[in-house]
């Protein structure tokens, strides 16, 4: 997705027991206004466990999000975006070498310390979707290389681990399909190593049949990426961002199909729905069948 959809926003996640799966699967919903939307979601889908925010560069994590997470008794997931908070990948002042050189060490330490105050646990998701050309930290633009991303991720981990005192988990989250699909931009080129991550995952969306696109089932989007990521590290797997439009198919059935994925992906630990409207598509849970499907998905308890 574009940098626009990575603006400061929030998701809430619930634990479910998916069909044919022995492990719990966290189901998340990305939302624009968590203070207003999270309580409503918790009423409609009991068992909410996570709240997640996007934080840009050296900016601090809004303490109101921590207070909200603690009040609603959820954990906090933070996606960290080392740029200036504007669209566009070509921003030389935000190249990955700046991260590795320690430009953000102070703000990362502050972020880690604040995350330690979340009572239900915290996850940090640094520099998501690096195998796309959309961001200042992407590995094929802005003077970056995949190796620069690996070095930057390791720097983030080192700083956060020291400040977090073991209370923050790190999630590595590329896009499910590399853009462009070239050998040098392969998903594996961005993997920092199994010892550097606690969780692994990918993002992907069903954009329906708009333009020259075709309807994509969840298994079509994630099966290949799941296999590739698990080959790198057999760790808990997150579908860190996803959503489906209604144009061209049945979005409620699409959500139900998410519940069947653990049968094919036994390490699947979380699914996060992008409950918002963007230029790329309208993924909001506004129609009753889709909302009901999400509610059903969120009924189970671990």
Language-model features: locations:
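Substrate-binding cleft of secreted/luminal carbohydrate-active enzymes
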Residues: 24-32, 121, 236-302
